[in-house]
Every structure is written in structure tokens, then in C-alpha cells.
Amino acid sequence: MAFAYDVAVDANSGNNAHAFMLGMVGFNKSVLEVGCAAGHVTKVLAQRGCTVVGLERDPAAARSAATWARRVVVGDVEDVGTWAELGEERYGAVMLGDVLEHLRDPLAALRRAVGHVAPGGMVVISLPNIAHGDVRMALLRGAFPYRETGLLDRTHLRFFTRETMRELCAEAGLVIVDTKRVVMPLFQTELGVIRDDFDQTLIDGILEDPEAETYQFVVQAVVDNGDHAVVALADRLAELSDHVHHEGVRRALLLRDLRERAEMEEEIRWLRRSLEEAEGRYAAILGTKTFRLVAPLRRLYGMMTRPEQPGSRPAPKRP
């Protein structure tokens, strides 16, 4: 049976939200998976020695996920009663993968999730980046193209940037300790934005934002226990992470420019070679005996077909 958001989980991918989240959770943890869907991630967690409890609103999907989970609570994440079924259970990791953007009140749901984090535990969240360059360029064209999945999934109710994601976590009592990014180059998302519709200067301006090609944010956060030293250290780690990301983006853009320049230079070299070959063929034609024999006839033909100059008079006829 096919379910909404059925996906294949590649835990070893270097540019995938599921892989990033699984890497943050690790092995042999107790996990609360909020929005477990049909259990694709649940299965990998179980294979890694994790004990999983899921929350899922779709009963059919929940039954599928139950194959790998210790149990699955069926209900709406925004319903207090759904959380009440968990009792006082706490977990080493609480996962919310592409969940919060679908909620009317993501902050309330996140606060409830934080209440189920065990001491020393973590919260792992993935969110799409509404500030991706393709969304910005679509807006410049007056478009907001909803899709079945992706950045503008038609079921999204809330939208997040890097800053609003951080604000959400802080308001929920979390401190972000690690941030990873799923990267999707401009003009390669499901939105169908076309490069030829935009001036290169505009594109370059958008790319000056290091997050312009960030498709999803994946963050690992811990509960803020009021330890200012921990918060300061987390903030410093976030700054360093951003610096590494920004430097990586800068170098990637530089490499892209160098590659484009190299391609242009190669095209110029090809054109030069083509011109030299054409000149060689033309010189060879000039040197042929046939060309020399017909040269006087070509000159005569040119004189006969030359247009008459303004003001010129025909030569007088001889008596």
C-alpha cells in the first residue's frame, strides 16, 4: 500500500535529511519519532538497536510503522490527548522530521516534545528552508507554485528560515548544538524556476546569501537547563558551524566560477581552432590553379554587377 511521503531512506547519503537525522541520533537509543509515517526511518532506527515509539495520525501508516516500533500512538500531534497517551515516558532522542511545518501551532507541539526528552537527551528536527533562492525567484515572477512535496508542499501551514527556526527552538526551551544542511542548487528544485528568466546579476546577488541553496535544515538541540556556560558554548559552536558552512559556500561558488571560466576558455580555444582551420581551407582554395584561372572572370563579373554610384554619369557614346 502506498502512503503519503513514502520515501526510500539512504542512511549513508551525504546530502539527505534522513541520513543527517539518523547520524545525530546514533545507535541504541530510546527514540520518540513524531510523525513516523509508514515507518521507513523507524525501520533503520530499529536496525541500529534503537527502541522506537511513534506518533502518527494515519492509522494505516501507523500499522505499517508498528512492524518496527515498540508501539505507535495514533493521533493528531496537535491534540493534547495524543501526547497524554505517552504518559511520563522520556526518551534519549525525540525526532521531528518534516513535521512542524505542517502544524497550526508548531511551538506548542515542540514544547510538548521537549517535555519527553530524558536527561542528557536530544531533539532532532528537520525543516524546509523557505528562503531558498528558487522560492525567492518564483516570488519575483509573482508565483508561489505549490507542489505535492518539497519546499512548497501544499499541506505546509508554516514556513521557516534559518533565523525563525532558531527562534522557534529557543522559545521551546532548546539550545541548538549542531546544524546540517541539505543543499539543492538553484534551478534544480521541484519548483521549475528557469535560469533564462533571470538576469545573471540578480542570480549572483541571491547567491551572496550563504543559505540561498539550502533546501532543508537539520538541527540537533538539547534542553536549555539554564547553564549559561553551556548556552554560550552552544552559541559558539553554532557560529563556527555557520562560518564553516559560509566558507564552504564561498569556495563552492568560486570553484563554480572557475569551472565556468574554464569552459568558456575551452570554447574560445575551439572557436580559434575552427577559425584557423577555415582560414587554412580558404588559403588552400586561393592557391589552386582553378582559382587563379577564374580570378579575371570574377573581377569582370564584379565590375558588371557593381551598383552605380550616386551622381555618376554613363560614359559618352563614341560617334
Functional labels for PLM-detected ranges:
Residues 7, 15-16, 40, 60-63, ...:
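S-adenosyl-L-methionine-dependent methyltransferase catalytic module, highlighting the catalytic core
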Residues 35-37:
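Class I SAM-dependent methyltransferase "Motif I" SAM/SAH-binding loop
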Residues 83-93:
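A short acidic, Gly/Pro-enriched loop at the edge of an enzyme's catalytic core
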